[in-house]
Amino acid sequence: MKIVVIGAGAWGTALAVNTAGAVEAAGSDAPRHQVTLWARDAALVKAMQAERANTRYLPGVALPGNLLLQGGGETSLAEAVSGQDLIILATPVSAARGLLQSLQQASVPVVWLSKGFEAPVAAVPHSAPSLASFGLMVHEIRAQVATDLRAGILSGPSFALEVARGQPTALVAASEHAEVRDALVAAFHGTSLRIYASDDIVGVEVGGAVKNVLAIATGLCDGLQLGLNARAALITRGLAEMTRLGVTLGARAETFTGLSGLGDLVLTATGDLSRNRKVGLQLAQGKTLAEAVKSLGHVAEGVYCARTVVQRAAGLGVDMPIAQSVVALLDGKLRPAEAVAALMGRGPTTELA
């Protein structure tokens, strides 16, 4: 199978490395797939070609010799996707609309890895690009700009570094098209990646987006040293918020007990490699949002989509007090201790409400 990964950030590079390193059978040296990693940044592409490593986004990981590296003005997006069997979009949500518009005539499956909602410019620090609309998940953007595209999402609990190293990881391939799900299983299911299929693309997308916001809250909780009891309560009640929003948007409740819901939430909220968790930890230390984001050097999608999640929930009448507290913190309207007091001071209710 010929596979092109668009976007050479940490996750795109990791998936390309893992897939390029897969072989036909145990004991064989024959590559299972022909994999291309494409990026717009000319300097990044040249550096990867020269060093056979992505030291900017995934340092310490060697790029396999059979991984093709393209882009940077030498190879256009159209040229990169031509003749491929599967197109993977490993870019931030902010790039999804433009890419899907460019690929709307693609005759092969197009699958994204990004987790989040489009966000208004005012909610995004550091001068994010203007967007045509906001509040949409990628499958909703696709419905607007590329209705005939056979598309899906690959999601679940997955730190890029562990995927690149070939450590065991389980993911969900979600699409309303069975052929897209089958293509993802054929492409990635192997010795280190286990792929589960789902047709609940709404649930898988909501889980992947909302967990980033909740991970900021959990990082804050741990940074304030509120204890393991508080962390467990926050994750559990956060899962309830995620499920309420997802079901209201048309997802199945059981999806949120799976890899793309509970699994991804636990990993992102507690794992030390989590960017969103790091934002919460730094806010707890008294750093400003701008300082926290700048120190990451990478995108933390929870910062970019938190307000959109809350706005979407409010428009649907969905109660999300933890997510609301995160937005108030990011906006500087609440201090960490005040956010904790506000959450603990809410009136009693039943657990499943």
UniProtKB/Swiss-Prot annotation:
Major localization listed first in the record, in broad terms: cytoplasm
Annotated NADPH binding sites: W11, R40, K115, A160, R275, V299, E301
Leading EC class: oxidoreductase
Location relative to the cell: Cytoplasm
Gene3D superfamilies reported in the protein's UniProt record: N-(1-d-carboxylethyl)-l-norvaline Dehydrogenase, domain 2 (1.10.1040.10), NAD(P)-binding Rossmann-like Domain (3.40.50.720)
Active site: K211
Annotated residues for binding of sn-glycerol 3-phosphate: K115, G156, S158, K211, D264, S274, R275, N276
Pfam family, one: NAD_Gly3P_dh_C
Catalytic activity: sn-glycerol 3-phosphate + NAD(+) = dihydroxyacetone phosphate + NADH + H(+); sn-glycerol 3-phosphate + NADP(+) = dihydroxyacetone phosphate + NADPH + H(+)
SUPFAM superfamilies, alphabetized: 6-phosphogluconate dehydrogenase C-terminal domain-like, NAD(P)-binding Rossmann-fold domains
GO biological process assignments: carbohydrate metabolic process; glycerol-3-phosphate biosynthetic process; glycerol-3-phosphate catabolic process; glycerophospholipid metabolic process; phospholipid biosynthetic process
Pathway, per record: Membrane lipid metabolism; glycerophospholipid metabolism
Keywords for the protein's UniProt record, in alphabetical order: Cytoplasm, Lipid biosynthesis, Lipid metabolism, NAD, NADP, Nucleotide-binding, Oxidoreductase, Phospholipid biosynthesis, Phospholipid metabolism
EC number(s) per entry: 1.1.1.94
GO terms assigned for molecular function: glycerol-3-phosphate dehydrogenase [NAD(P)+] activity; NAD binding
Any single GO CC term annotated in Swiss-Prot or TrEMBL for this entry: cytosol
Job description of the protein: Catalyzes the reduction of the glycolytic intermediate dihydroxyacetone phosphate (DHAP) to sn-glycerol 3-phosphate (G3P), the key precursor for phospholipid synthesis.
Family as reported in the entry's similarity comment: Belongs to the NAD-dependent glycerol-3-phosphate dehydrogenase family.
Listed name of the protein: Glycerol-3-phosphate dehydrogenase [NAD(P)+]
